From Swiss-Prot, chains A, B:
Mg(2+) binds at residues 74, 76, 78. GO terms for biological process: L-histidine biosynthetic process. Zn(2+) binds at residues 75, 91, 98. Homodimer. The gene is hisI. Catalyzes the hydrolysis of the adenine ring of phosphoribosyl-AMP. This is Phosphoribosyl-AMP cyclohydrolase. Keywords: Amino-acid biosynthesis, Cytoplasm, Histidine biosynthesis, Hydrolase, Magnesium, Metal-binding, Zinc. InterPro entries: PRA-CH, PRib_AMP_CycHydrolase_dom, PRib_AMP_CycHydrolase_sf. Gene3D superfamilies: Phosphoribosyl-AMP cyclohydrolase. Pathway: Amino-acid biosynthesis; L-histidine biosynthesis; L-histidine from 5-phospho-alpha-D-ribose 1-diphosphate: step 3/9. Its EC number is 3.5.4.19. Its cofactor is Mg(2+); Zn(2+).
Amino acid sequence: MAFLPKFDSAGLVTCVTTDAVSGDVLMVAHMNDEALRKTIATGEAWYFSRSRNALWRKGESSGQTQRVVEMRTDCDQDAVWLRVEQRGAACHTGRHSCFYRKVEMAGEGGARLVFVDADRLFDPAAVYRK
Amino acid sequence: MAFLPKFDSAGLVTCVTTDAVSGDVLMVAHMNDEALRKTIATGEAWYFSRSRNALWRKGESSGQTQRVVEMRTDCDQDAVWLRVEQRGAACHTGRHSCFYRKVEMAGEGGARLVFVDADRLFDPAAVYRK
């Protein structure tokens, strides 16, 4: 059975990346054909940045790389699930996961954010300065 | 801290839904403002179907509903992570998760799909016939 990813009009599939140990969702990102190929070939996570319009090896600036334990695809092959060993933190804010806040009801149909994990594993200002 | 979802040009955020017990990724879908509000207000998962261009309560046809245990959002608030109690199967093919196949290298840079979980918990032909 061939892997035939169904790219959207921008040439991308959605990628969900989880921590292979804890199961936590670390991040949601996108991959183009080249990012998929490089991820499969190297066993390291590569993505495509929509804001920078560029291929991107996870951790190339921060050192916070992701080793792929397993890659899956969904029923219609327009999404990919990576289970990874995360080195350090996945989030550019320095948190282990990008999903470090939960959404809680706040009356009148509103909602507020509450920190689940505020700890920073690195200092973004130090890591990303050029 | 207010929850201020960052909708894309189509008015959607990406939603990753995981099984609160196993941690498995069940599905990737989208939510518009109304789907988010209804999910928060009712504690049941609502999505927006891009193919049908319609709001959709998960399980309204199949009975395979999702009770929300926790909702999180990511660093830039353009994605949501739902941890749910899945009743039956999340996938329209009858499998528990939409991610029932893994992607494996197949030499020459190619890749093939291998079933991780082929079992169907319901018969789609019976459930979705009108």
